[in-house]
Amino acid sequence: NLFQFGDMILQKTGKEAVHSYAIYGCYCGWGGQGRAQDATDRCCFAQDCCYGRVNDCNPKTATYTYSFENGDIVCGDNDLCLRAVCECDRAAAICLGENVNTYDKNYEYYSISHCTEESEQC
Protein backbone atom coordinates (compact mmCIF):
# COMPACT_ATOMS: atom_id res chain seq x y z
CA ASN A 1 0.00 0.00 0.00
CA LEU A 2 1.05 3.62 -0.23
CA PHE A 3 2.33 3.73 3.37
CA GLN A 4 4.53 0.70 2.76
CA PHE A 5 5.75 2.22 -0.50
CA GLY A 6 6.58 5.41 1.39
CA ASP A 7 8.70 3.37 3.80
CA MET A 8 10.56 1.81 0.87
CA ILE A 9 11.13 5.27 -0.66
CA LEU A 10 12.58 6.56 2.60
CA GLN A 11 14.93 3.57 2.80
CA LYS A 12 16.14 3.96 -0.80
CA THR A 13 16.24 7.76 -1.20
CA GLY A 14 16.47 9.21 2.29
CA LYS A 15 13.52 11.42 1.30
CA GLU A 16 10.15 11.53 3.02
CA ALA A 17 7.69 10.26 0.42
CA VAL A 18 4.68 12.51 1.04
CA HIS A 19 6.63 15.77 0.80
CA SER A 20 9.00 14.70 -1.97
CA TYR A 21 7.04 12.39 -4.25
CA ALA A 22 3.28 12.66 -3.59
CA ILE A 23 2.83 15.43 -6.17
CA TYR A 24 5.88 15.31 -8.43
CA GLY A 25 5.95 15.61 -12.20
CA CYS A 26 3.15 14.02 -14.20
CA TYR A 27 3.15 10.55 -12.60
CA CYS A 28 4.34 10.58 -8.99
CA GLY A 29 1.25 10.56 -6.82
CA TRP A 30 -2.34 9.59 -7.52
CA GLY A 31 -3.06 9.06 -11.21
CA GLY A 32 -0.93 10.36 -14.05
CA GLN A 33 -1.10 11.61 -17.62
CA GLY A 34 1.05 13.06 -20.36
CA ARG A 35 4.78 12.47 -20.69
CA ALA A 36 7.07 11.83 -17.73
CA GLN A 37 9.17 14.94 -17.07
CA ASP A 38 12.47 13.38 -15.95
CA ALA A 39 14.06 10.13 -14.74
CA THR A 40 12.38 10.42 -11.33
CA ASP A 41 8.96 10.88 -12.93
CA ARG A 42 9.69 7.93 -15.27
CA CYS A 43 10.10 5.72 -12.19
CA CYS A 44 6.53 6.62 -11.23
CA PHE A 45 5.31 6.10 -14.80
CA ALA A 46 6.83 2.60 -14.78
CA GLN A 47 5.15 1.90 -11.44
CA ASP A 48 1.78 2.97 -12.87
CA CYS A 49 2.37 0.55 -15.76
CA CYS A 50 3.29 -2.19 -13.30
CA TYR A 51 0.14 -1.51 -11.29
CA GLY A 52 -1.84 -1.80 -14.52
CA ARG A 53 -0.68 -5.41 -14.84
CA VAL A 54 -1.91 -6.27 -11.31
CA ASN A 55 -5.60 -6.96 -11.73
CA ASP A 56 -6.71 -8.99 -8.73
CA CYS A 57 -6.05 -6.59 -5.83
CA ASN A 58 -5.93 -2.81 -5.41
CA PRO A 59 -2.24 -1.84 -5.61
CA LYS A 60 -2.59 1.42 -3.69
CA THR A 61 -4.39 -0.12 -0.71
CA ALA A 62 -3.27 -3.78 -0.68
CA THR A 63 -1.15 -4.61 2.38
CA TYR A 64 1.73 -6.94 1.60
CA THR A 65 4.67 -8.42 3.50
CA TYR A 66 8.21 -7.14 2.99
CA SER A 67 11.45 -6.62 4.86
CA PHE A 68 14.76 -4.84 4.52
CA GLU A 69 17.76 -7.17 4.44
CA ASN A 70 21.26 -5.74 4.05
CA GLY A 71 19.83 -2.65 2.36
CA ASP A 72 17.68 -4.66 -0.05
CA ILE A 73 13.89 -4.73 -0.13
CA VAL A 74 12.62 -8.31 0.02
CA CYS A 75 8.99 -9.07 -0.84
CA GLY A 76 7.64 -11.99 1.12
CA ASP A 77 4.04 -12.80 0.22
CA ASN A 78 2.85 -16.17 -1.00
CA ASP A 79 -0.27 -14.47 -2.37
CA LEU A 80 0.65 -13.80 -6.00
CA CYS A 81 -1.29 -10.55 -6.28
CA LEU A 82 0.16 -9.06 -3.09
CA ARG A 83 3.65 -10.15 -4.08
CA ALA A 84 3.19 -8.52 -7.51
CA VAL A 85 2.16 -5.23 -5.88
CA CYS A 86 5.17 -5.40 -3.56
CA GLU A 87 7.47 -6.04 -6.53
CA CYS A 88 6.00 -3.00 -8.34
CA ASP A 89 6.69 -0.83 -5.29
CA ARG A 90 10.13 -2.38 -4.77
CA ALA A 91 11.17 -1.67 -8.37
CA ALA A 92 9.88 1.91 -8.16
CA ALA A 93 11.66 2.59 -4.85
CA ILE A 94 14.93 1.23 -6.25
CA CYS A 95 14.46 3.33 -9.39
CA LEU A 96 13.81 6.48 -7.33
CA GLY A 97 16.92 5.74 -5.28
CA GLU A 98 19.04 5.24 -8.39
CA ASN A 99 17.74 8.52 -9.83
CA VAL A 100 17.66 10.65 -6.68
CA ASN A 101 20.30 12.89 -8.28
CA THR A 102 17.80 13.82 -11.04
CA TYR A 103 15.22 15.04 -8.51
CA ASP A 104 14.23 18.55 -9.58
CA LYS A 105 12.37 20.83 -7.16
CA ASN A 106 10.74 22.48 -10.20
CA TYR A 107 8.59 19.35 -10.55
CA GLU A 108 7.40 19.35 -6.91
CA TYR A 109 3.67 20.16 -6.72
CA TYR A 110 3.67 20.17 -10.52
CA SER A 111 0.28 20.98 -11.99
CA ILE A 112 -1.26 18.17 -14.01
CA SER A 113 -2.42 20.90 -16.41
CA HIS A 114 1.19 20.97 -17.70
CA CYS A 115 1.01 17.26 -18.54
CA THR A 116 -0.59 17.52 -21.98
CA GLU A 117 1.90 15.72 -24.24
CA GLU A 118 0.94 12.29 -25.48
CA SER A 119 1.85 9.56 -23.00
CA GLU A 120 4.38 6.86 -23.81
CA GLN A 121 3.10 3.30 -24.01
CA CYS A 122 3.68 1.00 -21.08
UniProtKB/Swiss-Prot annotation:
One GO location term (cellular component): extracellular region
GO biological process: arachidonate secretion; lipid catabolic process; negative regulation of T cell proliferation; phospholipid metabolic process
PROSITE patterns: PA2_ASP
Recorded GO MF terms: calcium ion binding; calcium-dependent phospholipase A2 activity; phospholipid binding; toxin activity
Disulfide-bonded cysteines: 26-115, 28-44, 43-95, 49-122, 50-88, 57-81, 75-86
Primary location: secreted
Location of the protein in the cell: Secreted
Tissue specificity of this protein: Expressed by the venom gland.
SUPFAM superfamilies: Phospholipase A2, PLA2
Keyword NADP: no
Key words of the record: Disulfide bond, Neurotoxin, Postsynaptic neurotoxin, Secreted, Toxin
Domain of life: Eukaryota
InterPro entries per record: PLipase_A2 (IPR001211), PLipase_A2_Asp_AS (IPR033112), PLipase_A2_dom (IPR016090), PLipase_A2_dom_sf (IPR036444)
Transmembrane segments: none
Subunit-structure text: Heterodimer of A and B (AC P14420) chains; non-covalently linked. The A chain (acidic) is non-toxic, and increases the toxicity of the B chain (basic). The A chain may act as factor stabilizing the complex structure and hence retaining its toxicity by preventing non-specific binding. Upon binding to the target membranes the A chain may dissociate.
Family: Belongs to the phospholipase A2 family. Group II subfamily. D49 sub-subfamily.
Function, in words: Heterodimer: postsynaptic neurotoxin.
Designated name of the protein: Acidic phospholipase A2 homolog vipoxin A chain
Organism phylogeny: Eukaryota, Metazoa, Chordata, Craniata, Vertebrata
